[in-house]
Amino acid sequence: MSLSANAENWMSRLPDETFLSVVSIPGAHDAATGSGWADGMDGLGDLFARTQELTLPQLWSCGIRAFDLRPCVYEDYMNLNHGIVPTSVHFEDALRLLCDSLRANPSEFIVVHLLHETDGDQVSDAYNQRIQELLQQEEWQDCLIDFRVNLKVKDMRGKMLIISRDKYATDPTIGAFFQNWTGELNWAKQQNARIVGKRSNTARLCVQDYSDTHAPGGVEKKVEAINKVLDFSTQHKTTSSSGVYWVFNFASAYSLVESLFGIEISSSDGYRDNATHTHAAIIDYLSQNEPGPVGVILMDYAGIDQSGDFNTRGKELVEAIIANNFRYLADQSDVSSPSRQKAEDDALFTLEGKQVASPSSHKAYIRKGADGKLRKKLLKH
């Protein structure tokens, strides 16, 4: 089965009444590492810290809508780092770029996984205050949204939801906090995570973030963990806000290491090698199993099928996750069409989400009626 999809403004085809937690969203782990390194850091970054080859604008263009951003504190600004290695991207510039992308494409929305990269701090004990001040800037207030359990696609269009792993204040300035995050392969702990917003808005969260696969059997454990979460997420039914269950399923990890000052640490090729296994596993899962939501999948080398000597299949995976939405959301016949354009009579789309001008007989399509509703349709002649 082909799972390719058109990435441009792909969220415009999502039904408005869909709960946000039900959308399958492709994401980029350490998203800024494809945008280059700070002066003098090219060698270190390319060997140890690169997880992406595409820049932030290129990731957006290929369909990425979840961004893992890891700010740290410098004297006059906040920088995006991967560990000790600084990228060339200031956090403020990344927010500006993403907001500009949303303003230019108001059908789309973004989820940000935010994590304080403490190893990169050049100023101590300043993160909490600085992050609050930055998130309060007037420049992007039109783009940011507070978390609610019952958020739907229609609420999110043109918006960015920032969810922080660090509790930088009693309540989030905007967005939400992650709670009980775990990198362990312990199913009870993985299902005990939460997303906590203002005014007691709390949603259940299942998380898989097993990040070190370089030991013998590590990759196999990672793939098994990914598939276990996929089994859970694709079979979980959300018919009301009480059933909302978020999922963050990391494809990212490193399976090879390099030595730095006598210490074995993650390597860029380690992220590449791991991706060859995890990306293939997810692509196979989506093509071989009944469709259903996969949540947010954060991957390395997103949008890139070949990185160096490694067959990462990152473009194929992004397209498969996008296309997956239109395999299961088409079954929801009572949801309204997401398009902000005037609905047309009998507009037909393939199950992968591509509009069809001349449909073939004896094939299944998604029909968007004049009432804006989506239904499956089999053409018999």
Where are these regions (language model features)?
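Loop/turn elements at helix/coil->beta-strand transitions in domains of secreted/extracellular proteins
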Residues: 62-67, 105-111, 140-141, 156-160, ...
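Residue-level detector of functionally pivotal "anchor" positions at catalytic/ligand-binding pockets or at interdomain
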Residues: 329-355
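Conserved, mostly hydrophobic/aromatic
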Residues: 59, 70, 112, 162, ...
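Long, acidic (Asp/Glu-rich), low-complexity accessory segments flanking structured domains
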Residues: 2-62, 75-109, 254-331
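C-terminal active-site rim and adjoining tail of enzyme catalytic domains
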Residues: 163-165, 169-331
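Acidic, His- and aromatic-enriched active-site or binding-groove loops in soluble protein domains
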Residues: 90-94, 132-148
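Active-site groove signature of glycoside hydrolases
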Residues: 73, 105-121
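C-terminal tail/sorting-segment detector
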Residues: 364-381
